[in-house]
Amino acid sequence: MNPAEVRNESMNELLTAAANPPASFEEYLIQNAKVVGDLVNSYIPSGDHPDMDTYLYGPLMKYSENGGKRHRPLICFAACVAVGGDIRHAASAASAIEHFHTAALIHDDIADEATTRRGVPCMHLTEGLGIAINTGDLALSM
């Protein structure tokens, strides 16, 4: 699926979930983490030049696909619903919030000289310091 199709499918799932909310906020977070992860990842571009995928977009996608709870974008959607908004208009903001958090984690791991994040070696150890810094900066720009 292309990114636009992923976004449409993800939004349809989130709209269905919003129409039938679970009994607890915790259930909402658990039930919707995967679909929001797919939505967030659909905002990661791909490049026409293979180096862009190798050295920038690929590392960010790999990092982003390694999970996380996706609480921040889910809270953004919940806030949108709480004030009567249309969550379709909150998708880019929700994704930007998660990408900002991703950038903070990548840069924090460098500053702290961390060795693992989410059970795997940190990006600066697997991809190199330069790629990790640039990937974190890319995530900030999204």
Protein language model annotation of sequence segments:
Residues 1-2, 119:
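Accessible peptide chain termini
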Residues 2-47:
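N-terminal amphipathic/basic leader segments beginning at the initiator methionine
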Residues 41, 49-142:
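Mg2+-dependent prenyl diphosphate-binding active-site environment of isoprenoid biosynthetic enzymes
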